Amino acid sequence: MGNSKSGALSKEILEELQLNTKFTEEELSAWYQSFLKECPSGRITRQEFESIYSKFFPDSDPKAYAQHVFRSFDANSDGTLDFKEYVIALHMTTAGKPTQKLEWAFSLYDVDGNGTISKNEVLEIVMAIFKMIKPEDVKLLPDDENTPEKRAEKIWAFFGKKEDDKLTEEEFIEGTLANKEILRLIQFEPQKVKERIKEKKQ
């Protein structure tokens, strides 16, 4: 997508990313340098993305979640992300606008990409989220959501869906915007992600 491999980020991409994210020119330029160090080709594979993501969460297992995040941002399904896709992924998972984040969250939960979400897909993502929560934090969760199965059940019940029903993107976004409890249940705590990213930038 027009990324320069010479070590400088093209003006067009820099301006576009500043427009679409909250990141500053300095942050983006610094990230681009470290991105090129990790990925000299200017593209990042799923394995490389998992490796970078795991550095944000050294005391948990984010591999499964990172795979789903990667899938949701690999727009052309070529198995790689360029710098622009990578930064948008970071932005959307931490600081995007509510509706943008929910559109992304829908694509995250729509594991097979068929345009609807099933209860099994909810469970698959929730299981990936649970691998990122420290065991001592899991113990602090309420009894009706302290396992992936219970949390998936609770999410599905909030949407008023039967076992084999499907959830459309519109239902997902409207239901989540109308109920903060659903929003809390469907995501890994974004504040923790933000804190980890800030630590890495320092």
UniProtKB/Swiss-Prot annotation:
The lineage of its organism: Eukaryota, Metazoa, Chordata, Craniata, Vertebrata. The keyword Kinase does not apply. Disruption phenotype: Knockout mice exhibit reduced scotopic vision acuity, however do not show rod photoreceptor degeneration. Rod photoreceptors have a higher visual response threshold resulting in a 4-fold enhancement in sensitivity to low light intensity, with no change in pupil size. Dark adapted rod photoreceptors have a reduced recovery time following stimulus, a reduced adaption time to background light and sustained photoreceptor signaling response following stimulus. Rod photoreceptors have an increased sensitivity to stimulus in saturating background conditions. Residues 189-192 are annotated as: Interaction with GRK1. GO terms for biological process: phototransduction; regulation of calcium ion transport; visual perception. The record marks 192 as: Interaction with GRK1. Belongs to the recoverin family. It is found in: Photoreceptor inner segment; Cell projection, Cilium, Photoreceptor outer segment; Photoreceptor outer segment membrane; Perikaryon. The modification Cysteine sulfenic acid (-SOH) is found at residue 39. It comes from Mus musculus (Mouse). This is Recoverin. GO terms for cellular component: dendrite; membrane; perikaryon; photoreceptor inner segment; photoreceptor outer segment. SUPFAM superfamilies: EF-hand (SSF47473). InterPro entries: EF-hand-dom_pair, EF_Hand_1_Ca_BS, EF_hand_dom, Recoverin. Ca(2+) 2 binds at residues 110, 112, 114, 116, 121. The gene is Rcvrn. Keywords: Calcium, Cell projection, Disulfide bond, Lipoprotein, Membrane, Metal-binding, Myristate, Oxidation, Redox-active center, Repeat, Sensory transduction, Vision. GO terms for molecular function: calcium ion binding. Acts as a calcium sensor and regulates phototransduction of cone and rod photoreceptor cells. Modulates light sensitivity of cone photoreceptor in dark and dim conditions. In response to high Ca(2+) levels induced by low light levels, prolongs RHO/rhodopsin activation in rod photoreceptor cells by binding to and inhibiting GRK1-mediated phosphorylation of RHO/rhodopsin. Plays a role in scotopic vision/enhances vision in dim light by enhancing signal transfer between rod photoreceptors and rod bipolar cells. PROSITE patterns: EF_HAND_1, EF_HAND_2. Homodimer; disulfide-linked. Homodimerization is caused by prolonged intense illumination. May form a complex composed of RHO, GRK1 and RCVRN in a Ca(2+)-dependent manner; RCVRN prevents the interaction between GRK1 and RHO. Interacts (via C-terminus) with GRK1 (via N-terminus); the interaction is Ca(2+)-dependent.
